[in-house]
């Protein structure tokens, strides 16, 4: 069911950030495995199945087949499936959330006049520095966001694991916008491990130091890196809310893939069901 070559393929062909094995394994501490043409992450009795099949992210039949296989895993107590559609196996009581990924072609379309003005404004006050070092001021900016914002527990956990992720993934990159005196005004984290798709992972800014357009400037640094590496698309992530969605559409980003998350508890299989599965397994 699992092998390093297949997991490497999941990252190489990733269309969504959850398919980047080093990222999810680092922030969640879970065990990656391949289930059909989908990658999953197991932790105890819980499984997260990233139901975007590698050969075609929107293949509903392949998604359903992967869910069927996942539900046969011994000891499974809870499953969370993310994909382009709700899996048919999800019961009516499943917890469901929906969003959509936005993406930009690389090179990105020419920015509109207002965006060009914002970029020029930020360029006058900030210099871009890129690398994979996680400095104290990066950590301080994340901590400030944690203290100031009302964030979901899962988001807080991910933010707390950013240093671990950046160390674990050779495809990660931090683009920082610094003032002339070296102070950090904003930074973005990108992921470039996939062959054709780059990922805009995270962005933070200091409202006291960051001029207008700071977030746009660090994103432009990630887009330039994607262009330099020959990637053809940047997944900007989910819409999340009106403000974040506006930021992405301002760049010309368009809806890329639906995001449907369904989570439910798995009832233990009865004796007859287990016996039937054993017979099928032995005869195949």
What is the predicted role of each segment?
Residues 80, 130-132, 235, 257:
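A generic structural-conservation signal
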Residues 70-71, 122, 226, 248:
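Generic structural signal for hydrophobic
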Residues 69-70, 165, 221, 225:
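A generic secondary-structure signal
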Residues 2-44, 84-95, 100-211, 220:
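A conserved beta-strand-loop-helix scaffold within acyl/acetyltransferase catalytic domains
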Residues 1-19, 263-284:
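Membrane-proximal basic amphipathic "stem/tether" segments
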């Amino acid at each position: 069911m699992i092998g390093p070559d297949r997991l490497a393929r999941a990252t190489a062909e990733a269309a969504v950030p959850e398919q980047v094995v080093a990222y999810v394994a680092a922030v969640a501490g879970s065990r990656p495995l391949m289930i059909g043409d989908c990658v999953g992450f197991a932790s105890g009795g819980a499984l997260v199945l990233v139901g975007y099949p590698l050969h075609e992210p929107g293949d509903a039949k392949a998604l359903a087949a992967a869910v069927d296989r996942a539900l046969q895993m011994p000891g499974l107590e809870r499953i969370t499936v993310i994909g382009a559609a709700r899996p048919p196996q999800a019961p009516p009581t499943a917890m469901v959330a929906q969003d959509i990924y936005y993406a930009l072609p690389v090179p990105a379309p020419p920015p509109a006049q207002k965006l060009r003005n914002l970029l020029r404004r930020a360029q006058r006050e900030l210099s871009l520095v890129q690398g994979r070092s996680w400095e104290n001021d990066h950590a301080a900016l994340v901590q400030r966001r944690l203290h100031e914002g009302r964030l979901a527990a899962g988001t807080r956990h991910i933010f707390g694991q950013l240093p671990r992720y950046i160390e674990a993934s050779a495809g990660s990159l931090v683009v920082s916008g610094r003032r002339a005196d070296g102070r950090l005004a904003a930074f973005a984290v990108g992921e470039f491990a996939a062959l054709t798709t780059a990922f805009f992972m995270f962005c933070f800014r200091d409202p006291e130091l960051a001029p207008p357009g700071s977030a746009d400037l660090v994103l432009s640094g990630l887009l330039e890196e994607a262009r330099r590496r020959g990637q053809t698309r940047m997944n900007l992530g989910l819409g999340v809310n009106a403000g974040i969605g506006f930021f992405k559409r301002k760049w010309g980003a368009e809806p890329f893939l639906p995001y449907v998350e369904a989570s439910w508890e798995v009832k233990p299989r009865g004796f007859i069901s287990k016996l039937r599965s054993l017979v099928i397994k032995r005869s195949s």
